[in-house]
Amino acid sequence: VGTRISYNLYKKFGNNKLRENTFAINFKGSAGQSFGAFGVKGLKLILKGDANDYVAKGLSGASIVIKLRDESNLISNENTIIGNTVLYGATSGYLFAAGQAGERFAVRNSGATAVIEGCDSNGCEYMTGGSIVILGEVGDNFGAGMTGGMAFIYDPKSQFAKKANPETIVWQTPETEYWNCLLYTSPSPRDCLLSR
């Protein structure tokens, strides 16, 4: 779901004429593979349920929200809500998932922004751009081949160093003035640089 709609939106409006979230579509249930694949700017998909592999594959500006059904008894941060290889090749757009992702989350992401509650092995593999926030544990080999972008990992148990791939990424706790400004005060990196 999303590919055909995105094709028609792009054909009619191009890639930059629509404002974000111009067309919002709500879904309920279990989505199959490639939910929201190639979604373009102007499209917002909201799913109450769960989704299989390749969610947001090739994401190109759309916003995707996936959360548990209202009647669910599950605790979001303890359960997988999206499958493997999510955000594969995404160039822009947003993904917000109230739950964990499977393996290879954000592989080859080059510009999308996402927030999830944990992922399995090989997260952010070959990532070249974009921003990822993971509010939970990550699996082994995190950041293998990652050459760009930023990943922010909530790590209250200090386990991230054991999971990260030390050959390709550098990590640190955000204790500098710049990061405190960016994360807690201003959404603009420029403002944080000027305030120094």
Indicate residue ranges for each PLM-predicted region:
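Terminal or standalone catalytic/regulatory effector modules within metabolic enzymes
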Residues: 1-52, 61-65
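Detector for repetitive beta-architecture
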Residues: 22-24, 42-44, 61-63, 92-94, ...
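Feature marks extracellular polysaccharide-active and adherence modules
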Residues: 28, 38, 46-50, 57-58, ...
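Glycine-rich anion/phosphate-binding loop at the beta-strand->alpha-helix junction
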Residues: 54-55, 64-67, 72-76, 96-100, ...
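Acidic/polar low-complexity surface segments
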Residues: 62-86, 166, 170
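Terminal amphipathic helices with adjacent charged low-complexity linkers/tails
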Residues: 155-178
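Single conserved hydrophobic/aromatic residue that forms the stacking wall/gate
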Residues: 184-195
